[in-house]
Structures are given as C-alpha cells and as structure tokens.
Curated annotation (Swiss-Prot):
The lineage of its organism: Bacteria, Bacillati, Mycoplasmatota, Mollicutes, Mycoplasmataceae. SUPFAM superfamilies: Pentein. This is Putative agmatine deiminase. It is an enzyme of class 3 (hydrolase). It comes from Mycoplasma mycoides subsp. mycoides SC (strain CCUG 32753 / NCTC 10114 / PG1). It catalyses: agmatine + H2O = N-carbamoylputrescine + NH4(+). PANTHER family: AGMATINE DEIMINASE-RELATED (PTHR31377:SF0). Belongs to the agmatine deiminase family. The active site is at 355 (amidino-cysteine intermediate).
Length: 364
C-alpha cells in the first residue's frame, strides 16, 4: 500500500538517479486538448503513438488516457503499450508525474511536487489544473510506492540531475515569481537538495529563447553522464539563443560538479529557427489558454530527447540540422541506438519528447 511520507528523500537516504540509468518503464499522457493541440489533437496523437511505440522496443510504456479517449488510444498504440484510464488536464508527463528517487538498496519512492500549470493564477497556460496536480500521487498508488508531497511548486522539466550529487536548473524558471514567490534562491536550493537528494545545484541564467515554460532546463541541456552534458547551441551571434547558450556554456565550463569534476560540454546545434505557420495556428481552438500565433518562433531543441534503455528517442523536424544532431548524439552515446521521431506536432504544443515522458528507475 502506498503511503505519504512526512520526512524528505535526503533525510531518508534517497536521491534522484540519472536518467541514463536503467528503467523499469516510461509513463506518458495521451493528448486531446483542442486548445493546445491542433485539429482536435489528431496529428499530435499520431506522434505520441510513434514516441510510445519507439520507447516500447526498449522498455515498458504506460499511457494514461481519459475516459473519452481510451478506446481511441488503445486502438492506435501497439499492444505492448499499457493503457490506463486516468483523468488529466493535458499531456506533459515530465512536469506533472512523480520524480522517482531511490536508495542504496534499490527501493524507490516518488516526489509529488505542487503543479500550477507553469505560472498559476498569474499566467498559467491553462485552468483548471487540479487533475494534473493529482497525477503524481495516483501513479505512486498504481506502483504501490511511498511518496513525499511537497508544498513547493516545481515541474519535472525544470531540473536535470546526474545521479551523482549534481542538479542543473535555470534561474529564469525557478526564480520566476509565479512559482515560489515567498522563497529566496537559497531556500529554493535547499528544497532541491532535500527532495532530490543532491549536494550541489548549478544555476544557469536562462533557458531556450521563447520557451513558454519560463526556460525549462530540459530544453536547454541533457545529462549524458556524471560530468558530461549536451548543450543547445548556435554559432549565429545575431540569434537571441546565442547569448543564452553562451552564458550557460561559460558557467558550465568554469564550474566543478558535486564530486569536483570539470564538466564536459558537447554542443548540440539547435534546429531552425522554426516558426508557427498560419495554417498551424488556425488549427488550434481559441479560448483562455496560451495562444499560438503565425510566425511565432518555437523553442525548438534537440536536447529535449528521452534516454531509454539502450536507445535515444530523438525529436527531429525535417530540418537541415537533423543529421548533425543524430551524428552528435551517436558520438556521445556509442552504445545506444538513435531512434528519431518527427516531432514538430509536439513542439507546436509547447515542448518535446522529454517533456511528454517520465522514466521509472529500475528497482533491485
């Protein structure tokens, strides 16, 4: 039976493992909001199917689906993808799912952060969000694992860890007044250390340009292994992303991680720039959610990939830099197969493959 813990993971000897460590399964949520996904979410659903089926070749996948969409999802997904009915507000499993922590004996627990739709009442991307805020606890109940409920607003995409004491995040997101306005930077860092079980937090100033999540770190970089990250990059000094990536690069290459290692940074050239077309914008229902406008620049990034067991599930865009991204990642993951998925439809919704997935680490 799953129960709520009254301490913190760090006090109990738990920490957030690296995403490159072995998984038991991956969790996702089926898209259906017509005010975020164009044409009634049908194009996005096809891409989610491709992502889930690609991951399922390497590890188990569970897709959470509303009652209304259950039969549709079940018919479209491969039979080896488990489908479970669960109410939800949208499909960003990385941000609403539990952060899984483990201890030295291989036991796992979940961290249930407060979710407020990326800015709460001061600018959240949709309302209400109570169904999404309940997903982490429900997943822990399904898995029969204990969990920690925090009073701290955080989305899973706003943090990356190396599994060895170091956590990466951005000031643009975690210091945003729409997250935890009553906490100082030092208090926020202490929360990260307590609930992720880390020793050092590396703060990067900014995320990817025009990222509506206020600069989630998972769109800016990904962790290859302890002491090694890939970083979204452009050599175009006139591109607004250049200064953002340069600031991150300078900090990363002049900072030691929690174990005293110099951090190796592999530059991963960004796609595009990519912009929303008039046809794409007109396919999204207009209401009180975040609007999508023609010629709006999208926060496209190849760093927003999922590390499966022995594979990298990489978003591509039909862009001239797709092949370079594959080559770059194959060089840093020589023992992984690079599985590419055309992912523009996810990008149109505001994120990408890492944003719609959440790994569950293996237990001993």
């Amino acid at each position: 039976m799953s129960k709520k813990m009254n301490s913190t993971p760090k006090k109990d000897g738990f920490w957030m493992p690296g995403e490159w460590e072995k998984h038991d399964q991956c969790w996702m949520i089926w898209p259906e909001r017509s005010d975020n996904w164009r044409l009634g979410a049908k194009p996005a659903q096809r891409v989610f199917v491709n992502v889930a089926n690609a991951i399922a070749k390497y590890e188990k996948v569970t897709m959470l689906v509303s009652h209304q969409q259950f039969e549709n999802a079940r018919n479209l997904l491969d039979q080896n993808v488990r489908v479970i009915e669960m109410s939800n507000d949208d499909s960003w499993m990385r941000d609403v799912g539990p952060t899984i922590v483990k201890n030295k004996d291989g036991e796992i627990r979940g961290v249930d952060w407060v979710f407020n739709a990326w800015e709460g009442f001061k600018g959240g991307l949709y309302f209400p969000w109570d169904k999404d805020d309940a997903i982490a606890r429900k997943v822990c109940e399904i898995c029969n694992i204990d969990y920690y409920r925090t009073d701290f607003v955080l989305e899973g995409g706003s943090i990356h860890t190396d599994g060895d004491g170091t956590l990466y995040t951005t000031e643009e997101c975690l210091l945003n007044e729409n997250r935890n306005p009553d906490l100082t930077k030092e208090q926020i860092e202490e929360n990260l250390k307590e609930y992720c079980g880390v020793e050092k937090v590396i703060w990067l100033p900014l995320g990817v340009y025009n990222d509506e999540t206020n600069g989630h770190v998972d769109n800016l970089l990904n962790v290859v292994s302890p002491g090694h990250v890939v970083l979204t990059w452009t050599d175009d000094t006139t591109d607004p992303q250049y200064e953002r990536s340069k600031l991150a690069y300078d900090i990363l290459t002049n900072t030691l991680d929690a174990k005293g290692r110099k951090i190796k940074v592999t530059k991963l050239h960004q796609p595009g720039p990519l912009f929303i077309t008039k046809e794409e914008a007109e396919g999204i229902d207009v209401c009180d959610t975040m609007s999508r406008e023609p010629e709006q620049r999208m926060p496209a990034s190849y760093a927003n990939y999922y590390i499966a067991n022995n594979a990298i599930i990489l978003p591509i865009f039909g862009d001239k830099y797709d092949d370079l991204a594959v080559k770059t990642l194959q060089s840093v993951y020589p023992n992984h197969k690079i599985e590419t998925v055309m992912a523009r439809e996810i990008l149109l919704g505001g994120g990408n493959i890492h944003c719609i997935t959440q790994q569950q680490p293996t237990t001993k």
